[in-house]
Amino acid sequence: DVLLRKSLDDSSAALREFAQEYHLEDYAEVKAICYIAGAYLMHTYVAEWGLPNLSQVIYDRSPTQERAPRAVMDRFPMVGVLALGPVLRDLSNVDWPEPPAAHVLRGLMVENRATSIMRILESEARAMGPLEYNWQKIDPLAADAFHLPLDHDMMYIRWDILGEPCLHFFEHGAFPADLPRERLNDNPFDKSLPIPEVVR
């Protein structure tokens, strides 16, 4: 459990300790799956300490959830900080570091459903500008991507949907060909969007 601590500084320190404890530099290759805050921590770690054996990264990208820290701080600042600590404030205004070097193969999993908190904060999220779902615009250097009918909370538990595509990307450098490369709906805030049944 590297993420998240009470602040981004504490979280970065936890990641350094994790990397040292497990001697990441000794592996032939390091492949990572990064969620939103995790991408910030990995990028800052690589920028400061380097990780030349990092070969592949799959990013969870959410056009709605990536606006959550700022949206919460705009509307519920005291509640947000009380619930999640100073890390929420940190994430709402931090300068995002550059991604790893071009030799690192990047894949994207793009969420197409807003969480319940982001449905409450829809007006704040939309006020920040258009929501971009074209994966080649989200990350022009990404090798491949696919879209999911999941929200950010589901991304932590729906490995029945995520597991095989991630393993396929790590083995072949691309996601399975039958996965959707285009956005799945016009309104990610629509709570009536169908949720996939659990695959057992």
Regions found by a protein language model. Give the residues of each.
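C-terminal catalytic-base region of ester-bond hydrolases, centering on the histidine
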Residues: 101-200
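Serine-dependent carboxylesterase/thioesterase catalytic core
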Residues: 5-103
